Curated annotation (Swiss-Prot):
This is 2,3-bisphosphoglycerate-dependent phosphoglycerate mutase. The lineage of its organism: Bacteria, Pseudomonadati, Pseudomonadota, Gammaproteobacteria, Pasteurellales. Belongs to the phosphoglycerate mutase family. BPG-dependent PGAM subfamily. GO terms for molecular function: phosphoglycerate mutase activity. CDD domains: HP_PGM_like. Catalyzes the interconversion of 2-phosphoglycerate and 3-phosphoglycerate. GO terms for biological process: gluconeogenesis; glycolytic process. The record marks 181 as: Transition state stabilizer. The active site is at residues 8, 86. Keywords: Gluconeogenesis, Glycolysis, Isomerase. Pathway: Carbohydrate degradation; glycolysis; pyruvate from D-glyceraldehyde 3-phosphate: step 3/5. Its EC number is 5.4.2.11. InterPro entries: His_Pase_superF_clade-1, His_PPase_superfam, Phosphogly_mut1. It catalyses: (2R)-2-phosphoglycerate = (2R)-3-phosphoglycerate.
Amino acid sequence: MELVFIRHGLSEWNALNLFTGWRDVNLSEKGVEEAKEAGRKLKAAGFEFDIAFTSVLTRAIKTCNLVLEESNQLWVPQIKTWRLNERHYGGLQGLNKAEAAAEHGDEQVRIWRRSYDVLPPVLDPKDPNSAHNDRRYAHLPADVVPDCENLKVTLERVLPFWEDQIAPAIKAGKRVLVAAHGNSLRALAKHIEGISDADIMDLEIPTGQPLVYTLDDNLKVVSKRYL
């Protein structure tokens, strides 16, 4: 069985070196081309999908659409869920990473970005950019909508969707595409690859590159490769 992950193409804020998180920014021109190229690679390699899962953030949705369009599979059903959203970077969202490092120190920012269980500064729920004020999350209980997350909390958010939707689809023989974000995919990779809390700090998933897992019947990773 094979499973394909793709991190969204380079976003406008990626290009500006800003913390993005749950802020809904668009793909950059380069990101659009990355997503299209990913679709072409998947088509050339003969990948066909039965279902696609993505987040409720524009950059991932557009990446999913472009990948499917370029591979002549735009008709494939898509399920969008907040559980596949990027990690919520709290009060860091919208800040320039270099400026944050200058203020707080390189090591502190590295820990906020890459550690498994250290939380970033909290975003005030009354902030105009808080997810509490975004109607795409209006159906969720207020205490479920995050104000900041680390990778541990992100995994706790993502894992129920893996267990309830993605894993059963794979076990049913469906060919699955997951178009999401650097940290939601890192969380899933940690789970399916059995990566330790320490080693996950070093895992980087590049934008717009299809990551193909070969899984056994128990959804354990046999191999992985980038196209």
